[in-house]
């Protein structure tokens, strides 16, 4: 490999939510964290070089995101990585994917309307939807009948997809996505597809952008910040299907939100990542796949009842512990007090009996995490 991901980067004292903010969520300081979904790896070298060059310029005035360098970087990335043509005339820009989601929900729903999601559900969705006074209507991941029934209800206005799915790492098939599109059209429901994990799909699986399936009212919302690990720079972009909705989104961002000018370093990072970061992304994805295989080997060797398989996308190990019959609260006490690690409980995503272990990190840390989880489970079974 060209890049060495085995060397840990010390993130303590950098205002990191994962490392320095762990005590606020888990009630104890100094824990080894496997929590919020960012990685411990430094950004791709081409991104760092581009940022350094832009900082050296020294002027950070108001910036236009609707420039050809950014548009063409997005267009070419989708063309090469996803064999998909993007209409850059339908691009929008916002500080974050959740910011885009909130804006679209204000456009397409009213307080009290329902937004349908697959469960377990990313907790950011719950906060965004509930915070706007809309109802989050969950349906199980593998229950098409429940999805159809939920979308057919009179107050359902939006199908909110997570593609690939967080927290499970599920990659939707072409048949599934086409089915969602047909069902949404039949029920008169808009579709918002959050595809921030799209570029971290593992071998043997393929992500298909919603632009291939969208009918009527729809939007794809995404960002390079997740796969290339620069979320603190902010910045996201999307594709809005209908011309009138696209114009309305841009108008709202530039007027009501006052967000016409993006963070220039985010634009620089996106362009550099999409133009020169592909090799780094391929290597970090392969490295993380090794971490996930390590987790599977350790867990399944210790607990034959689990038969855990790595996710199809991402660096978050979503682990079903229900076969072991372990109490969630007892497990968290063992992890925090006994092992001094922070691992997200499944209850955060509406799924008691699961945990979500972030292994976007050096192998030594991944080994420490799965080792701690295995020991804690061993004491409780």
Residue ranges and their predicted role:
Residues 267, 271, 288-296, 308-321:
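Conserved glycine-rich beta-strand-loop-beta hairpin in the small C-terminal domain of fold type I
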Residues 325, 334-343, 348-381:
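PLP-dependent enzyme catalytic core of the Aspartate aminotransferase-like
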Residues 216-289:
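Conserved core segment of the aminotransferase class I/II
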Residues 2-96, 103, 273-274, 380-381:
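N-terminal small-domain helix-loop-helix segment of the aminotransferase-like
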Residues 132, 186-187, 339:
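Helix C-cap/helix->beta junction micro-motif
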Residues 60-183, 199-214, 219, 371:
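Conserved core of the PLP fold type I
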Residues 117, 138, 191-193, 343-345:
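Hydrophobic residues in well-ordered beta-strands that form the structural core
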